[in-house]
Amino acid sequence: MTVLMSPDELEAALRAVGAARYHNRHPFHQLLHGGKLDKRQVQAWALNRYCYQAAIPIKDATLIARTDDSELRRIWRQRLVDHDGTQPGEGGIVRWLALAEGLGLDRDMVISERRALPATRFAVRAYVDFVRDRSLLEAVASSLTEMFSPTIISERVSGMLANYDFITRETLAYFNARLDQAPRDADFALDYVKRHARTPEQQQAAIAALTFKCDVLWAQLDALHHAYVSPGLIPPGAFGHDGIWS
Ligand SMILES: O=C(O)c1cc(C(=O)O)c2c(n1)C(=O)C(=O)c1cc(C(=O)O)[nH]c1-2
């Protein structure tokens, strides 16, 4: 039988999910950060990850649309501002596109998502659908991977700067803002989950939501590894298929 945990025990259980399943443990990230990939493989990472970036504000708008809690909406809408900016040329999506262009990718190709891996699109879509279809508590809990992102972002920026001559500090500027935004967002979401998960079932649902989200991130890296590292099977239509790297 599942027992009711204290809020701090719940937090510990959530952190244990991240320790076991967060995407910092994925071999593709270890290759990426360790300088073991060539430029095309890094380009593949950037253009696939664009799909995730582009979906994040859609899932945040979905969450906002679902709640009648005005305070939650007010706080959550900062995430839309962070990703979309307040005027053209601002925000995380634009900064991600600058990263992709800094790697030599064509901006319109990246935005079109037509060269992304099928599994990337499916994983990203699953996240948006989850936030639309599950309870609000699960929707908020699914964002909690951000508790773990500052560490991986620091590792990524220092590793990529040290190991690739085609990467500059400007290319990676996207991540600077995330180092402030992610802890702020995660602190709020964690507090929300600790206050609103009041039954054993709700607590287990929150843990399962975070597990699901780790799977969303992991699946995207599995797809990259399968296509671009080993066995190197690039799906039809995807970046690099038939030797076309554009
Ligand atoms: O670089 C990363 O490893 C990483 C991880 C995550 C995450 O853990 O979901 C996010 C981000 N970056 C990120 O940049 C971002 O905007 C973001 C939003 C969310 C979310 O679930 O709402 N996760 C993440």
Swiss-Prot record:
GO terms under biological process? pyrroloquinoline quinone biosynthetic process; sulfur compound metabolic process
* Alphabetic keyword roster: Oxidoreductase, PQQ biosynthesis
Cross-referenced InterPro entries, in alphabetical order? Haem_Oase-like_multi-hlx (IPR016084), PqqC (IPR011845), PqqC-like (IPR039068), Thiaminase-2/PQQC (IPR004305)
Q: Which residues form a coiled coil?
A: none
Pathway linked to the protein: Cofactor biosynthesis; pyrroloquinoline quinone biosynthesis
Q: Which reaction does it catalyse?
A: 6-(2-amino-2-carboxyethyl)-7,8-dioxo-1,2,3,4,7,8-hexahydroquinoline-2,4-dicarboxylate + 3 O2 = pyrroloquinoline quinone + 2 H2O2 + 2 H2O + H(+)
Q: Which NCBIfam families match?
A: PQQ_syn_pqqC (TIGR02111)
Query: Which function does this protein serve?
Result: Ring cyclization and eight-electron oxidation of 3a-(2-amino-2-carboxyethyl)-4,5-dioxo-4,5,6,7,8,9-hexahydroquinoline-7,9-dicarboxylic-acid to PQQ.
Q: What is this protein called?
A: Pyrroloquinoline-quinone synthase
Species the sequence originates in: Acidiphilium cryptum (strain JF-5)
